[in-house]
């Protein structure tokens, strides 16, 4: 669902944006080299850079022809808020232990931006007009006025939902098995 939210967000900004998906965990595969060899210069990389590796190649960044990297935006996670939400649900008795006993399923702790667990930092190097538009988009997401899974959505196989259909539910988002059409 993260890949699709990213793809839909990119498409909202630029309807002609194309997402090229390269898996970073494949053995003997240099995903960055593959993207750059295709002429792709704007990359959504790891959310964080390892402490032992000084790098600017995280979040959404751009690689210039000379190899210089400039950051555009990066997600930030408030792990304190994450654990606070989980502990509060345990203390209030709303925690569902049955999720822990299904060893064949990955656990999904999906919290949107409105929860305070995740936010985004925009680069100070962004053009003021882009910063203005992205700030308005962020505020729309936080207020619930804008949601990537509202409105018409197309997968690579065709229409997922038309513009009048309700927003995808949390369960539909977490369990999606399709890729956006861009």
Residue locations for each model-derived region?
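Extracytosolic ligand-binding ectodomains
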Residues: 1-182
């Amino acid at each position: 669902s993260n890949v699709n939210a990213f793809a839909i967000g990119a498409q909202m900004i630029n309807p002609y944006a194309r997402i090229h998906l390269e898996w970073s965990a494949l053995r003997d595969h240099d995903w960055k080299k593959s993207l750059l060899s295709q002429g792709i210069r704007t990359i959504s990389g790891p959310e964080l850079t390892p402490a032992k590796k000084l790098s600017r190649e995280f979040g959404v960044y751009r690689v210039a022809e000379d190899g210089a990297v400039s950051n555009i935006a990066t997600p930030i996670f408030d792990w304190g808020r994450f654990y606070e939400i989980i502990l509060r649900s345990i203390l209030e008795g709303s925690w569902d232990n049955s999720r822990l006993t299904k060893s064949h399923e990955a656990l999904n702790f999906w919290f949107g931006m409105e929860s305070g667990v995740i936010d985004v930092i925009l680069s100070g190097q962004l053009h003021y007009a882009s910063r203005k538009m992205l700030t308005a988009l962020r505020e729309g997401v936080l207020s619930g006025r804008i949601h990537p899974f509202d409105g018409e959505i197309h997968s690579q196989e065709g229409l997922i939902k038309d513009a009048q259909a309700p927003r995808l539910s949390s369960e539909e988002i977490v369990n999606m098995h399709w890729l956006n059409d861009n």
